[in-house]
Regions:
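Alpha-helical interaction/dimerization surfaces of two-component signaling modules
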Residues: 26-31, 49, 96
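Hydrophobic/aromatic residues positioned on beta-strands within the core alpha/beta folds
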Residues: 84-86
């Protein structure tokens, strides 16, 4: 198997559900053990990490932890952002996130596909 392009990358995952973060960490670290993986369960913690560290990609829970505010911060830092969705987004939420430059969405029931999903996010020019 080819080495993942995620190896060596710095990833921040933000979700108010610790179980989701645990699954993300297991999936990502299994698929690319040489990447750096940080987590945050609140807006404040995520904002502090975004201010103090550099990341290659940020995974955000769009509806929790003030996801739209964090999306705005990440986009202003020119970071690649992947949005997690627990349910189908309302047309209003989808439109708002798209207008804010979110381009990649993954349903939480597909977390087992996170590594190839993030590889696509990193290699696609939105």
């Amino acid at each position: 198997m080819a080495e993942s392009i995620l190896n060596g990358k710095k990833i921040l995952a933000v979700d108010d559900e610790p179980d989701v973060l645990k699954v993300l960490e297991e999936e990502i670290m299994d698929g690319c053990p040489k990447c750096t993986f940080d987590t945050a369960t609140s807006f404040e913690a995520a904002s502090a990490l975004l201010d103090s560290k550099s990341y290659d990609i940020v995974i955000l829970d769009i509806m929790g932890v003030r996801g739209f505010d964090l999306l705005d911060i990440a986009v202003k830092k020119d970071l690649k952002v992947a949005m997690l969705t627990a349910h189908a987004l309302s047309p209003e939420a989808l439109k708002k996130s798209y207008e804010m430059k979110a381009r990649a969405y993954l349903p939480k029931d597909k977390l087992g596909e996170i590594v190839p999903f993030l590889e696509d996010v990193l290699t696609t020019d939105f």
